[in-house]
Regions:
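Long, low-hydrophobicity, acidic/polar, solvent-exposed interaction domains
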Residues: 2-199
Length: 199
């Protein structure tokens, strides 16, 4: 029997333009997707060799921020809060990789959605009732829920970006956005790769 995926769009909460890109730091998770590619030929990006996903919580560099006064790419205060992780999905009924991080940060919402899903599977709710109640839960501002900012490097593949968006749906994340890499993100990634070279 074929199945369809119900897509839940991000919430339409009222946010004025100046606050749109400023997220409460305690709620923020930034995901950076990147890919290692073969050499470009005639301006065409090379084939993807491997995809990478990184994340940090709060602001770049944590509370102290980032400092690279001499511009060598190594952060002076050694406060790089960027972590490498993978898109792993579930194993033995447990979330793995970035899914586990997002699930833990959105725990209150996920627990309520899981209970609702159990009622729906037991035929206690119609599809319409389930979708309406799930939307209410995802948008309930009294629940602790993260704001996820997804950023892609110039080398990132569409596959990694789509995987990041899939994780928003899987983990019932209602507040997320795709944004551009900025200087702080690039500095964190460069510093991380100096300390942890790719093999």
């Amino acid at each position: 029997k074929s199945q369809t995926l119900q897509i839940s769009l991000p919430t339409n909460e009222k946010v004025d333009q100046t606050e749109q890109n400023k997220v409460k730091q305690s709620e923020a998770i930034t995901i950076i997707v990147d890919s290692e590619r073969e050499e470009a030929v005639d301006g065409v990006p090379g084939k993807v060799k491997k995809n990478y996903v990184y994340y940090y919580e709060g602001k770049p560099g944590g509370e102290l921020g980032i400092v690279d006064e001499n511009g060598d790419g190594v952060l002076d205060n050694a406060n790089n809060n960027l972590k490498e992780i993978e898109f792993l999905g579930n194993a033995n009924g447990q979330a793995q990789g970035i899914r586990a991080v997002l699930r833990e940060r959105n725990k209150q919402v996920v627990e309520k959605i899981d209970l609702l899903k159990a009622d729906w599977r037991a035929k206690k709710l119609t599809d319409e009732q389930y979708q309406a109640q799930a939307k209410e839960i995802r948008n309930d501002s009294t629940l602790k829920r993260p704001t996820v900012i997804i950023k892609a490097t110039a080398q990132a593949s569409y596959e990694t970006l789509v995987s990041a968006l899939d994780e928003m749906q899987i983990n019932s994340i209602s507040k997320y956005q795709i944004d551009n890499m900025n200087a702080a993100d690039s500095a964190l990634l460069k510093d991380y790769l100096i300390a942890h070279p790719r093999k």
